[in-house]
Amino acid sequence: MPSKQLFADHIASLENNYQSALQFCGVSEESSILIHSGSEHFYYGDDRAIAFQAHAHFLHWVPVNKPDQFLLFTPGQRPRYLQVVPSDYWHDQTIDSADWWTDSLNIIRLDRVEDIAKYIDTANTLYLGQEAEMIQGLLGNQLSVNLSPLLSYLDYKRAYKTEYEIAQLRIANAKALIGHKAAADAFEQGLSEYGIHQAYLQACEILEYEAPYTNIVALDEKSAILHYQNKRRGSAIDSQVLLIDAGYRVNGYGSDITRTYAKDSAHPVFRTLLENMETLETELVDSVEVGNNYTDIHALTLSKVGALLRKLDIVNADDGVMLEARLPQLFMPHGVGHLLGLQVHDVAGFQQDLAGTMKPAPAYSAALRNTRTIEENMVFTIEPGCYF
């Protein structure tokens, strides 16, 4: 169970950020911010609901992944959680509550979404969320929707994690490792991609939609497809290589772990490559320093991958020639990592300031997702790769 004090400190930090955001945007000091978790949606032409995922700015305040929930922030007032619990015999509408987080919020229970109107001063409220048409139909067109300077400010601040957030991410990583161990064991036993995937879910005790992203479970040649989306069910007793990219979510915060395993019977050059890549990853982690730019880590990664390719006689060219010709990018077309938090690819990886100034990925590696200067309390991944 998370610490009640850590969560209270987290909420206090959010209150400070949101009050500063209102001042930054130059709106009235009496303004409120209404954050919507989102609404349930359905597949086109069908009555089957798409698995719901709450808006991350809502989850920042409330660890409840349910549709049509609202957090109302007003400076000087305790944050109000407008908890909509419909009367419904078709679905379980229970919202699990625990005092470690409920004690920091003023919870107002409502039966219908329409009931939120009595708590909203529309003329002085800024709405954050996806359902602009729905919320303006309910509260009026004068409601400010997704004010760009406000989103820029809040997105930028999301890169800096509180102690509570870091604690959730630590747990998410520890839980994912249990699943990765089970997946590795299943691979050694000759299970199929589908079987390995199920072993991961079972070990983590989660359903597919509860994971922070869709698991990638790739055997042999399919491991060369970066976002391989299938789960083959055929016999895999002779498979030599497993790549698994899978995480775990805790109170909205997700881990992101990619591992590659090779059997003893795999090609010796590949096994050597794998061992060296694991060493390379550790070296990259050791190189992280506050004040450096994340793009420097990526450039160092490309240099190290290139040197390794030359060392193993996979590429025959000098380091300088390889980098100029962008040969390492043929083997590592992705970025070395990204910010991590309420979204696996967390927001504001390119954002350089509160105003929303963007620094795009360098032309030599357009897939890089983070160009921020490294600062304390940031959480990001370091995940070099070498794909064939």
Question: What is each of the regions a protein language model found here?
Answer:
Residues 1-388:
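Active-site neighborhoods and metal-handling regions in enzymes and metal-associated proteins
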